[in-house]
Amino acid sequence: MGAPKQKWTSEEEDALRAGVRKHGAGKWRTIQKDPEFSPVLSSRSNIDLKDKWRNLSFSASGLGSSKLRVPKITGPSSSPSSSSQPLLLPAANKFTEATLPADAEKKPQDGKTLPKYGAMIMEALLELNEPNGSDIAAIFGFIEQRYAVQPTFRRFLASKLRRLADSNKIEKIDKSYRLPDSLATRTPAPMNASAPKQKDPSKPSKVSKAIGLFSASSPALEAAMAAAVKVADAEAKAHDAHDQTMEAERIFKMAEDTESLLIIAAEIYDRCSRGEITTLVPVAQREI
């Protein structure tokens, strides 16, 4: 084990930036051998320079840029190697899909939307009772017939259905939704020995009439509906931005690994062309 890495100083960072401006990104050995920068960067390896430059690049862009600057891949370096020391060949990286912790994927459910929307969705799924689930259009059509809702409610409905599915309150089958079997088959116990009175499906209940009247005449409820739609849109955009950031970081890492392999291949070719014997020693990939 080597000595512990020291924290980068501002002088070393300035020297690294100046070296990249002079020789370009990826020319870490050339920057180290440059008399202008070697006194300052003598204690750093080419891997240290590469990692530090990546951190500086991400810090400058804030990981939020839609265009990722991929370092230019150049040809083999013309500087000869004076020794035939074993060449360290980094092991191949294992790229896996970025996953979030289970707690991070769960979005807050309480206090964000009005309680009656969830009840309206549950009522629609219970009445439709499709074995393979009902799609968003069918659920929206049922609710629109029962209650006076705005046309923008459909956009909010998709977000609400995803939340209910994430919280295991409903089941998602492809692009359709249905109630769990435990809820779909649950029947209330009778209050007395006589058979319960059947409701006429064509006549909405008193609660439904009250909700529909309130929805059509209350400016406060319309404002709450518009705010809920904006919240749902913001959450969807934030999720898409996070996915794009993770994909950009993955592509940037792939470009760096490709550049490293090209540098190693160029050095192997340079040594073999001079008749030197090159030994490849695999090393374990560091975890980032």
From Swiss-Prot:
Family per similarity comment: Belongs to the histone H1/H5 family. SMH subfamily.
Gene Ontology molecular function terms on file: double-stranded telomeric DNA binding; protein homodimerization activity; single-stranded telomeric DNA binding
Domain comment, as recorded: HTH myb-type domain confers double-stranded telomeric DNA-binding while the H15 domain is involved in non-specific DNA-protein interaction and multimerization.
UniProt region (Disordered), positions on chain: 1-42, 62-87, 181-206
Domain H15: 113-181
CDD domains: SANT_TRF
Name of the protein described by the UniProt record: Single myb histone 4
DNA-binding region: 28-56
Compartments where located: Nucleus; Chromosome; Nucleus, Nucleolus; Chromosome, Telomere
Function noted in UniProt: Binds preferentially double-stranded telomeric repeats, but may also bind to the single telomeric strand.
Chief location category: nucleus
A single GO BP: nucleosome assembly
Compositionally biased residues, Low complexity: 76-87
